[in-house]
């Protein structure tokens, strides 16, 4: 076991503080509309240019192991805020540094760290309650666009694209961000249930130019096993042929005699039919087939449920206004399922998302929810160079997450204004605390609430303390617009922050800063001296 280097008390706190400060200094320059970029060297390829706080934080690793512990803890603040709210990582880092730096001064002066932490926690609860009171729900397309624009560093094009995507797919829909091949940033929306399985034979196509099979007013047969023989399959085919409607068959696989029969009927009898493999694998496949059944108002024909293919009737088949099948994917538009059943299924999936601990499972469940409830929007980000594209893609990601957070919990006046508006409420609460050190802990939070606003002002080349005093002297929604160097009503000006982002940033910052304040010892490995570890080769340095 390697020997350890241990630091105690004042020495430990100084090391943590240096690490926290080093990371925070690199991250906080990106805050606000006039925040600067950070260029990150990469081991291969061109350097990365970013204004995203969590991206900067993740790249920082300090040489001194004790200082690095402090930096890693603040990195955790940024990561946790990104995980919970998807944005606000720079604000969280600024708050964490402000709470820890002020707390450290008081611990050094003799305050009890445990009481300070209790005071900090109580103050944060008061501020969070006040934030929820100030918050107002998102009601209009315009507000969504404003939130996205602010989060994308005042890029109105990105803001409008995200608002349009949200409007088209709804709050349960899925918005994904991809790299485009051209210069333009565009939005593609796939409405209805879409899955990446195409037709099993090109003979099913109805449009030779687009190589697609389009079925109008189609019936949908959903079966969870392979179909290879024609005997069991024939009764349902005859019923569909008599009805005169087209048929989409979704099964684990369709092969041999069954596939040949479908192709022959398509070519010779003009029977409008298309066969595709079921999406997904294992239990996820079964769940997706059930989703399709509910969406189309049909039944999943499953032998596990005592159903047999030969006994299938027309009433068991799903129905859809339109089905589009290409070589690679299938889209079911306007499934005619019962609306209440679809909503109940969506609620069930939401519950599974809440209960799931796996990020991968959550992502897959979210995809299923999106396909059932609204559709999928893809924002394809274009730019002149790869470096610019990556930087723009980061901003689109931030804006997308901020928008979802705003829809979930509402919006606040932005630019650090909302936290400053909580100062009078917290000031009134502090005298209620009976423990003196708890009062000091609450005052630490009180002072930290103005840190994001001061940093936004500093990045715009202004004196933060003066700007903060001016904002405090004004009415509720009025704040400092750093882009235009003016005081304005932040809600009317469209400078908005999602409530969830502000709340998560404060909670994460206070949690980690409180832990750091109550730290009394640091234990790290002593680095090995690599120069003396390898023995000299025999005969090295001799002349022959």
Swiss-Prot record:
GO cellular component terms listed in the entry, alphabetical order: cytoplasm
Keyword RNA-binding recorded: no
Location relative to the cell: Cytoplasm
Enzyme class (EC, first level): isomerase
Top-level taxon: Bacteria
Name of a matching Pfam family: Cpn60_TCP1
Catalysed reaction, written as an equation: ATP + H2O + a folded polypeptide = ADP + phosphate + an unfolded polypeptide
Keyword ATP-binding: yes
Annotated ATP binding sites: 30-33, 51, 87-91, 415, 481-483, 497
Main subcellular location of this protein, as a coarse class: cytoplasm
Annotated keywords: ATP-binding, Chaperone, Cytoplasm, Isomerase, Nucleotide-binding
GO MF term set: ATP binding; ATP-dependent protein folding chaperone; isomerase activity; unfolded protein binding
Any one Gene Ontology BP term: protein refolding
EC number: 5.6.1.7
Function: Together with its co-chaperonin GroES, plays an essential role in assisting protein folding. The GroEL-GroES system forms a nano-cage that allows encapsulation of the non-native substrate proteins and provides a physical environment optimized to promote and accelerate protein folding.
Family membership noted in the UniProt record: Belongs to the chaperonin (HSP60) family.
NCBIfam families, A to Z: GroEL, PRK00013.1, PRK12849.1, PRK12850.1, PRK12851.1
Self-association state and partner proteins as the record states: Forms a cylinder of 14 subunits composed of two heptameric rings stacked back-to-back. Interacts with the co-chaperonin GroES.
Listed name of the protein: Chaperonin GroEL
Source organism per UniProt: Chlamydia felis (strain Fe/C-56) (Chlamydophila felis)
Gene name of the encoded protein: groEL
């Amino acid at each position: 076991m390697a020997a350890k280097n241990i630091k105690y008390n004042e020495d430990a706190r100084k090391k943590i503080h240096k690490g926290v400060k080093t990371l925070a200094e690199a991250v906080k320059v990106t805050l606000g509309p006039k925040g600067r970029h950070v260029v990150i060297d990469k081991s291969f390829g061109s350097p990365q240019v970013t204004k995203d706080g969590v991206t900067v934080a993740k790249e920082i690793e300090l040489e001194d192991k004790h200082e690095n512990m402090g930096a890693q803890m603040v990195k955790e603040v940024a990561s946790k805020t990104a995980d919970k709210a998807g944005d606000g990582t720079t604000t969280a880092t600024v708050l964490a540094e402000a709470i820890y730096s002020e707390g450290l001064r008081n611990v050094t002066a003799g305050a009890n760290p445990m009481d300070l932490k209790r005071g900090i926690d109580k103050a944060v609860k008061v501020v969070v309650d006040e934030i929820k009171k100030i918050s107002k729900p998102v009601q209009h397309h315009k507000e969504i666009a404003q939130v996205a624009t602010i989060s994308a560093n005042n890029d109105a094009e990105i803001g409008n694209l995200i608002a349009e995507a949200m409007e088209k797919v709804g709050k349960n829909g899925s918005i994904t961000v991809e790299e485009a091949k051209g210069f333009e940033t565009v939005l593609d929306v796939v409405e209805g249930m879409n899955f990446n399985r195409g037709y099993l034979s090109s003979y099913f196509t109805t449009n030779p130019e687009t190589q697609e099979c389009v079925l109008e007013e189609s019936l949908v047969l959903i079966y969870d096993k392979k179909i290879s023989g024609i005997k069991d399959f024939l009764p349902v085919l005859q019923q569909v042929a008599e009805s005169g409607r087209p048929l989409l068959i979704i099964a684990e696989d369709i092969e041999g005699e069954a596939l040949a029969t479908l192709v022959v009927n398509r070519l010779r009898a003009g029977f409008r039919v298309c066969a595709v493999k079921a999406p997904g694998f294992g239990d996820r496949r079964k769940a997706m087939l059930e989703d399709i059944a509910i969406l189309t108002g049909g039944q999943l024909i499953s032998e596990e449920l005592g159903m047999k293919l030969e006994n299938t009737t027309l009433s068991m088949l799903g129905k859809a206004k339109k089905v589009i099948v290409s070589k690679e994917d299938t889209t079911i538009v306007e499934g005619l399922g019962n609306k209440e059943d679809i909503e109940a299924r969506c609620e069930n999936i939401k519950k599974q998302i809440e209960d799931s601990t796996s990020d991968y499972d959550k992502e897959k469940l979210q995809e299923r929810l999106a396909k059932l409830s609204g559709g999928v929007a893809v924002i394809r980000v274009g730019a002149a160079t790869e470096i610019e594209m990556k930087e723009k893609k980061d901003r689109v990601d931030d804006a997308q997450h901020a928008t979802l957070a705003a829809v979930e919990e509402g919006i606040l006046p932005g630019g650090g204004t909302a936290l400053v508006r909580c100062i009078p409420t917290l000031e009134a609460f502090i005298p209620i605390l009976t423990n003196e050190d708890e009062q000091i802990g609450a005052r630490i939070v009180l002072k930290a609430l103005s840190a994001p606003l001061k940093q936004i002002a500093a990045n715009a080349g202004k004196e933060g303390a003066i700007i903060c005093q001016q904002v405090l002297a004004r009415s509720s929604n009025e704040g400092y617009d750093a882009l235009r160097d003016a005081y304005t009503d932040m809600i009317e000006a469209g400078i908005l922050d999602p409530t969830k982002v502000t709340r998560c940033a404060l909670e994460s910052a206070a949690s980690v800063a409180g832990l750091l304040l109550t730290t009394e010892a640091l234990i790290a490995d002593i680095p090995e001296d690599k120069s003396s570890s390898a023995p000299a080769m025999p005969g090295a340095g001799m002349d022959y």
